[in-house]
């Protein structure tokens, strides 16, 4: 079951490969995610020193968060992958046009995981085509309902 989805990613990118990565989170972040207080629409993934980081995701702290720490809602979070997967991703990202985008946060075995995707950006005409297909599918469903 997914906690947060990045629906914008499927509209803006051609998804080629998916990977499941662990997240290094603080306690207040896990509690906030359980309450559904996160947003990954503006998030992106970068590679630094052979490590992978998630940048730009926003996890709003709960009002009951501890008073002795000052939570940073948009801090950089480290993603945990196997070394071979990281090497493969670095090789692909260095190719022209590939990028890494977060798709969703979900639970697996009580831990929060992040699905990331190796993706290529869509051009404007591709986005328009996707929108036309979606509109046509909606119209087809409407016609089928009206016909029965």
UniProtKB/Swiss-Prot annotation:
Protein's UniProt keywords contain Cytoplasm: yes
GO BP terms, alphabetized: trans-translation
Record keywords: Cytoplasm, RNA-binding
Stretches with biased composition (Basic and acidic residues): 129-142
GO cellular component, one term: cytosol
Main location: cytoplasm
Protein's cellular compartments: Cytoplasm
Family: Belongs to the SmpB family.
Role: Required for rescue of stalled ribosomes mediated by trans-translation. Binds to transfer-messenger RNA (tmRNA), required for stable association of tmRNA with ribosomes. tmRNA and SmpB together mimic tRNA shape, replacing the anticodon stem-loop with SmpB. tmRNA is encoded by the ssrA gene; the 2 termini fold to resemble tRNA(Ala) and it encodes a 'tag peptide', a short internal open reading frame. During trans-translation Ala-aminoacylated tmRNA acts like a tRNA, entering the A-site of stalled ribosomes, displacing the stalled mRNA.
NCBIfam families (alphabetical): PRK05422.1, smpB
UniProt-recorded name of the protein: SsrA-binding protein
